[in-house]
From Swiss-Prot:
UniProt xrefs under Gene3D superfamilies: Dihydropteroate synthase-like (3.20.20.20), Sulfite Reductase Hemoprotein, domain 1 (3.30.413.10)
Species the sequence originates in: Trichormus variabilis (strain ATCC 29413 / PCC 7937)
Pathway: Isoprenoid biosynthesis; isopentenyl diphosphate biosynthesis via DXP pathway; isopentenyl diphosphate from 1-deoxy-D-xylulose 5-phosphate: step 5/6
Gene Ontology molecular function terms on file: 4 iron, 4 sulfur cluster binding; 4-hydroxy-3-methylbut-2-en-1-yl diphosphate synthase activity (ferredoxin); iron ion binding
Keyword 4Fe-4S: yes
Assigned protein family: Belongs to the IspG family.
Keyword entries, A-Z: 4Fe-4S, Iron, Iron-sulfur, Isoprene biosynthesis, Metal-binding, Oxidoreductase
Catalysed reactions, as listed in the record: (2E)-4-hydroxy-3-methylbut-2-enyl diphosphate + 2 oxidized [2Fe-2S]-[ferredoxin] + H2O = 2-C-methyl-D-erythritol 2,4-cyclic diphosphate + 2 reduced [2Fe-2S]-[ferredoxin] + H(+)
Binding site for [4Fe-4S] cluster: C317, C320, C351, E358
Cofactor(s) listed in the protein's UniProt record: [4Fe-4S] cluster
Protein's UniProt name: 4-hydroxy-3-methylbut-2-en-1-yl diphosphate synthase (ferredoxin)
Annotated function: Converts 2C-methyl-D-erythritol 2,4-cyclodiphosphate (ME-2,4cPP) into 1-hydroxy-2-methyl-2-(E)-butenyl 4-diphosphate.
Amino acid sequence: MQTLPTPTTSSNTANQSTFDTTIKRRKTRPVKVGNVTIGGGYPVVVQSMINEDTLDIDGSVAAIRRLHEIGCEIVRVTVPSIAHAVALAEIKQKLITTYQDVPIVADVHHNGMKIALEVAKHIEKVRINPGLYVFEKPNTNRTEYTQAEFEEIGEKIRETLAPLVITLRDQGKAMRIGVNHGSLAERMLFTYGDTPEGMVESALEFIRICESLDFRNIVISMKASRVPVMVAAYRLMAKRMDDLGMDYPLHLGVTEAGDGEYGRIKSTAGIATLLADGIGDTIRVSLTEAPEKEIPVCYSILQALGLRKTMVEYVACPSCGRTLFNLEEVLHKVRESTKHLTGLDIAVMGCIVNGPGEMADADYGYVGKTPGYISLYRGREEIKKVPEDKGVEELINLIKADGRWVDP
């Protein structure tokens, strides 16, 4: 996916405000996942997950390729058994020989040490869930954990996690410590409750084990299906890491967001809120739809915040009684004609009241000023007035005259 190195507003804009509107991202360490880097000031990375059975080699290869071709930079694959880990090795090799080397994350959950050790040989990153990596048999009669019991289980976790940490460290590979609000370990629930604090403490326990073994190629996630819980958990995690001198990158996502318009709104509400605070280095929009549907949402969020520019930015008014042409129809025509011109800002405004001012940051403007005619702008400068039925054609001619047109 093409990304302009530094998204900015048009250089044609006069009297630029001295107020800095750039999002200041939290400083994090770079974590290499194959040929992609998460954190360290690199562009926010877009991820997704295939929904094929990993034992279906050809289906999984095709699914990974479909995602990667539309801009998914890292792809996650579920690995619930040793057989799936072996299959993923074959998937990886088949991708290399038939397509290209795509960074893969293995998703490992219940009692996952043996699975994780096997799959770590073949892919770039392993995701583990602290609440499920070491099985704690629930005790319905329990009312609390003593400190000794808490620490005893912590030591078992260390013994189970250490081999994976060491093999990832020695191979230069990465780990995501992926906490889920819905699967906190029982002792965390008893000690901290079903809270963002419990999520943070769960992550910190695993981070400290990794650090004690000199492994810091770590990414952290704090996912929840409720946006307020998710936002609070990530903010608390960022604060605790800052207080402790930790600089691990954060993977953002609202888990189980659903589908359709609301699923997209819910994901955006959580992810964009944190990104606007400067929190977040990689994102996944989780939809109950084909994974390919997630990728455009990710890039739209990043573009809207000015964090990555991978498409044309269109500015258009909502239309009102002053509008002098069919705004929805014209915007569609302009978009279809120019959507391949990555990097441009184009404004389509229905009347003169807000047109020139609202589109001041755009490279080109298409404004209704006189019935039957369109005024075309370059930045704030009106270039010419043309008949309405020639508006889109003349806009293209203006872009071509400026040497900014490329054939689709």
